[in-house]
A protein has these predicted regions:
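Glycoside hydrolase catalytic-domain context in secreted enzymes
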Residues: 1-311
Length: 311
């Protein structure tokens, strides 16, 4: 239960030093995720891509079920079907030993030339909000932490690393945030990926108003925030103080730099405890610690899943 999970988290936090060799705040190859800690009984967090199907590493010989693209799912207007897709994807992710899905993409389609428009559902925030809830619930019911992305106002590929998106409060609330709010408030999403871009001059992954004031304090988000890969992080202390939990993929600003920030009293140890406990809570909540929801490899590309894909 929830109380038991929180007690287990406190036990593990009590035994973990800030300078622990197993960095829980950054990537750990070859797991494509974060390292575990055998001494404290913390398993690794292994991530996977499951947008249209499971990408199990870079091996083209690995077969998985290919489902419709999100933009096609959006055209179906069928949340129940997408919930079934979420269940099938979760089972295949677990069959490959993964426990976090880096997706789905909840950015609204804003430009016809957007290189990843296929990965989004629609230009309609309401439709996105309706589709995402059953998908998140299905994923997390079957042992996969769902990670909606890219938070937020990440709507083009060109200049995505350095663009500064100027957006007023009404547009933010009515267009860009509703899908994420639905995923968290109604779906119970336990992970959110922060984006490469800036919003009104502040980097998304060090945006305290978005990551703490809105995501956690307004919406009640209890999971952890993951940075987009390689170039979304730009700082150590500001990111930690904003509520950014895990840096991906290379550990450039966290790791030893985070240890140094604590030593220099730029970041308090209780902030570190909070960042770690939020990640552990998500892992407990979906059963990663208990290794629940194991599925055989035979479920991958099964007849049942192929039939769902054909619908």
């Amino acid at each position: 239960g929830l109380v038991g999970s929180e007690m287990c988290i406190r036990d593990r936090l009590g035994g973990m030093a800030v300078r622990d060799d197993n960095n829980p705040f950054g990537s750990s190859d070859p797991n494509f995720g974060t390292a575990g800690n055998a001494r404290l009984g913390i398993p690794p967090l292994i991530m996977g891509h499951g947008i249209t199907g499971v990408r199990a590493g870079r091996n083209p010989d690995v077969k998985a079920t290919y489902f419709a693209t999100p933009i096609a799912i959006g055209s179906s207007w069928d949340p129940i079907l997408y919930g079934r897709v979420g269940t099938a994807l979760a089972k295949e992710l677990r069959a490959f030993g993964q426990n976090l899905n880096l997706g789905p993409t909840l950015n609204v389609i804003r430009h016809p030339l957007g290189g990843r428009n296929w990965e989004s559902f629609s230009e309609d925030p309401y439709l996105i909000s309706q589709l995402i809830v059953p998908f998140v619930k299905a994923q997390q019911t079957h042992g996969i932490i769902s990670g909606p992305k890219h938070f937020v106002v990440n709507n083009q590929e060109k200049h995505r690393f350095d663009i500064n998106n100027i957006v007023d409060e009404r547009a933010l609330r009515e267009i860009y945030l509703p899908g994420f709010k639905a995923a968290v408030v109604s779906g119970g999403a336990l992970n959110v990926m922060c984006a490469y871009n800036r919003i009104n001059g502040t980097q998304a992954c060090e945006h305290k108003r978005l990551l703490t004031d809105i995501l956690r304090n307004e919406w009640g988000f209890r999971g952890f925030v993951l940075s987009d890969f390689a170039r979304a992080m730009h700082s150590t202390a500001p990111s930690a103080l904003a509520g950014m939990n895990v840096e991906m993929h290379a550990t450039k600003f966290y790791g030893k730099n985070l240890v140094n920030a604590v030593t220099q009293k730029l970041v308090a140890e209780n902030v570190i405890d909070q960042l770690l406990s939020q990640k552990l809570f998500a892992m407990f909540k979906v059963g990663v610690f208990d290794d629940f929801h194991n599925y055989p490899k035979s479920i991958v590309h099964s007849k049942e899943h192929q039939e769902i894909a054909l619908e």
